[in-house]
Amino acid sequence: MIERIWSGQSRLYWLLLPLSWLYGLITFLIRQSYRLGWRKSWRSPVPIVVVGNLTAGGNGKTPVVIWLVEQLQRRGYRVGVVSRGYGGKAERYPLLLNESVTTVQAGDEPVLIFQRTGAPVAVAPRRAEAVSALLARHTLDVVITDDGLQHYALARDIELVVIDGMRRFGNGWWLPAGPMRERESRLASVDAVVVNGGVPQTNEIGMTLTAGMAVNLLSGESRSLSQLYDVVAMAGIGHPPRFFATLRDAGVSIAREVAFADHQSYQPEQLALLTQDTMQPLLMTEKDAVKCKAFAQDNWWYLPVDAVLAEPQGTQLLDKLEDMLNRNVGSRT
């Protein structure tokens, strides 16, 4: 129902407009309080790059974070990542990730980023504390914050916004009547806009998600998607239909699609019942896999995806980031 309301297919949004106006007023006042100096933002001794979004729900932000970390690493930068750690509950914060930290503690996205990139990752509700914890343990050139565009308590040097190119901004209303955390006009003040799917507009950078080979959760074996038949596809992400569409575009034979809530907590029995027998493949997102690996069965597979930014815009973005990072580093010395 909420997707229908947010997409503009239902007029029931007007029932939620009073709450949306209140949400919009509060977010406006919070941002103004920092812009006018009534509240102080903490500035890191190293440059901060925010990768965020204007809307609730999955936009493909985490693949962009992974892409950015890997690209900057290839250029010789020492990169750290901080996150709110949504969906996790640690005994204390800030929490620095290592091989023994679970998604229950840190949340699924930070664990995924840590495993994919090998970059130092820290989580904390107050991102400034996460940044400080990283810098106390690691020598870094730049810190990327996964989400946090609206977290103005942390000063930032560069802002990237990721947009779902198919859904864009829905009906345009603030939460909860619409999907907006901030109005579309906020894009005028960010450094780059990356559009996941759809048709990019002027000054937007197109992006696609490219599927790799399916990987078995238990053995680590890789197989071509064409080798998996009659699969049960499951996704507990912000927008599950995107994952299912990726599978269909790759020609995967799907027997059933099962959508779960974002940051879903899974039980072994719950997932074991999804397949008819141990021979039928269960294919999930990589984000789900980091939560399910501990109790995986032989027929469970995940599909890693990589963000691919349009060229030459992708390279131009990296060049721009590198130039800005170098200038910011110089200004801090």
From Swiss-Prot:
GO terms for molecular function: ATP binding; tetraacyldisaccharide 4'-kinase activity. It holds the Pfam family LpxK. InterPro entries: LpxK, P-loop_NTPase. One of its GO terms (biological process) is lipid A biosynthetic process. It comes from the Bacteria. It is an enzyme of class 2 (transferase). One of its GO terms (cellular component) is plasma membrane. Transfers the gamma-phosphate of ATP to the 4'-position of a tetraacyldisaccharide 1-phosphate intermediate (termed DS-1-P) to form tetraacyldisaccharide 1,4'-bis-phosphate (lipid IVA). This is Tetraacyldisaccharide 4'-kinase. The lineage of its organism: Bacteria, Pseudomonadati, Pseudomonadota, Gammaproteobacteria, Enterobacterales.
